[in-house]
Amino acid sequence: MAASNLADNKCVPCRGGTPPLTHQQIEPLLAQLEGWQVEDDKKLIKSFKVKDWVAAVDFVNRITPVAEAEGHHPDLYVRWGEVRAYLWTHKIDGLTESDFYMAAMIDRVFAPTAGASRQAK
């Protein structure tokens, strides 16, 4: 399943007691995403480089309706020229497939503006 296919899935609300994905389950999902890293098998992280502060805020504003529609909200760190996205399922303090779906959706939102002045790191 390519990243674009991951983005075609719907995020599923996590129920308490759902186990987080194991390292073995994470690896094939991560391989479908470009530039995302996993921290301690608990969080997905990616830094997006953009032209300036306005572009950073614009990118966050374009992520917002997607996150709202999916009911799955990334933590976003904004600074001049960069937006850093953190994804994990808070209820289980780990990763679920929905985190990977949302990562692919964020990549899809970023793609139309990617270019020489706006690039993911």
Feature map (PLM): residue ranges:
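Long, contiguous binding/interaction regions
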Residues: M1-E34, E39-K121
